[in-house]
Amino acid sequence: MDVRRRPVKSLSSAKTATAGEPPKSQQQHPKASDALPLPLYLTNGLFFTMFFSVMYFLLHRWREKIRNSTPLHVVTLSELAALVLLMASVIYLLGFFGIGFVRSVIRPSPDAWDILEDDNAINEEDSRREPCAEAIDCSLPPKPKIVHMVPQKALNPKSAFADMMVEQPALAIAPLTEEDEEIVKSVVTGKIPSYSLESKLGDCKKAASIRREALQRITGKSLAGLPLDGFDYKSILGQCCEMPVGYVQIPVGIAGPLLLNETEYSVPMATTEGCLVASTNRGCKAIYASGGATSVLLRDGMTRAPVVRFSTVKRAAELKFFLEEPLNYDTPAHVFNKSSRFGRLQGIKCAVAGKNLYIRFTCSTGDAMGMNMVSKGVQNVLDFLQSDFPDMDVMGISGNYCSDKKPAAVNWIEGCGKSVVCEAIIKEEVVKKVLKTNVAALVELNMLKNLAGSAVAGALGGFNAHASNIVSAVYISTGQDPAQNVESSHCITMMEAVNNGKDLHISVTMPSIEVGTVGGGTQLASQSACLNLLGVKGASKESPGSNSRLLASIVAGSVLAGELSLMSALAAGQLVKSHMKYNRSSKDITKLSS
């Protein structure tokens, strides 16, 4: 008799299965009898017979001991064997009845990120039944073809897994030829500079391989875990990185869909922090179920501020008055605008410190982040000013009044790059069922933590929970400059109860988001793919600058989702629990080699 409990296939679960993940009905757990080669009916019959026979034998023996006044703890060899068989049969039967019964009647408790499945209103909101979503094929895609595969030698040939192919990391490097060996030795001894390998060899991949081998010999440290193959080193030559020896792999997760300005976006996030993508995804779910978020672009202008020095304070002040006079604005603007098709001067602001003058130029830069563009225009203006102010000494093209890659009040107040505000109204039932908290608790915690707490800490632009987490993850995945996360993460998060205290209004104001969709790391294959996913790849031909502005709005919307979810976890006391579940390494660090 077949006593297995067969899982019932559910149509609803099959429909909602995500791509690449089998539905729950198809996820079968191994049974106890799967390890035995006998047919199922024979295995069941064997263990049923064993259980009742051994039980009868033991009860009969114990009855005789009681009659003969023999201690029960004194067992013979046959009784010991019977006990072992009894335990084996009990374990087998529990594998069918006990565990299966528990799985069928006990439902796992919902974790911090799950919405209640029996809530029809939330399920309808979360079903994403929009025109663009209905066209999506939710069936399981075919398994991708795996290249670079080698047989696993350590497997048992008789095992069912012996014929499987497993992917091997690109760690093994082809042996060096005699010519390459000589080059490596020359690099090690210093006869050939490491930085000149690309120009001497004319092969960027070969140069990276030789530099890598030379580095290992010089330091005596292995780079076996750092991949070398599978990267286009020519694409970074003279643009992204010098003297490469490999590349670092960072996993990319997807949060969303983020419903922003009535459009859905799947947000790529490159991170090694567990729970970050899951938390942001929960925020996106809450925003989606509440009707979406709205963003507004307030400003769009990159800055560069050179520092110049004069012999007297008076001369420094004269240049300040000249540049800030509206009647004189057209002259430097004309000189500045000649440097680029897209760079357009928007304004000049000066600050005097003794004999030194700091000149802050602001300009539009199209779809580029624009730091190089504005620097080129500034240099042209400085060269022009030398004719009227020959005693002006240019001390540096950047005097930190910009201010780039540093927390600064000038960016927090005046803005730099894109200044964006994003808001959403989260419904009461969504706050309770998706975010597992309530509106009053969120409003109070936001005031105590993000506003008062940040003020107590003397924060500068840090009136938020973790904006930099989301900004950094999106920046890395889309090829932005990660160092500009410093000023780009300036954010103030506001929350208040609306609609008679039932719903939550949340907003993030970010005055200095510095992003671009052309130049720098955006042209790399992986980063370009992420930009394409968002629909902002490259420069916009119809409206120059619109792609970078949209990317800034998506960053702000993602920060809104991340802030909403983390604050909810804090208000509900779920932060530690979720991080223990999603942000814990399973590796024994004591066994890792240094």
Swiss-Prot record:
Q: Which InterPro entries match?
A: HMG_CoA_Rdtase, HMG_CoA_Rdtase_cat_sf, HMG_CoA_Rdtase_CS, HMG_CoA_Rdtase_eu_arc, HMG_CoA_Rdtase_N, HMG_CoA_Rdtase_NAD(P)-bd_sf, HMG_CoA_Rdtase_sub-bd_dom_sf
Give a Gene Ontology cellular component term annotated to this protein.
Answer: peroxisomal membrane
Map out region (Disordered) in residue numbers: 1-32
Q: Where is the active site?
A: E273 (charge relay system), K405 (charge relay system), D481 (charge relay system), H579 (proton donor)
What EC number(s) would the UniProt record show? 1.1.1.34
Main subcellular location of this protein, as a coarse class? endoplasmic reticulum
Kindly give the membrane topology term recorded for this protein. Answer: Multi-pass membrane protein
Which Pfam families does the protein's record reference? HMG-CoA_red
Side of membrane Cytoplasmic, spans: 59-81, 571-594
Instruction: Give the GO molecular function terms.
Output: hydroxymethylglutaryl-CoA reductase (NADPH) activity
Task: Look up keyword Transmembrane helix and say if it applies.
Answer: yes
What the record says about family reads:
Belongs to the HMG-CoA reductase family.
Enumerate the NCBIfam families for this protein.
Answer: HMG_CoA_R_NADP
What is this protein's record name? 3-hydroxy-3-methylglutaryl coenzyme A reductase 2-A
Originating organism: Panax ginseng
Gene that encodes it: HMGR2
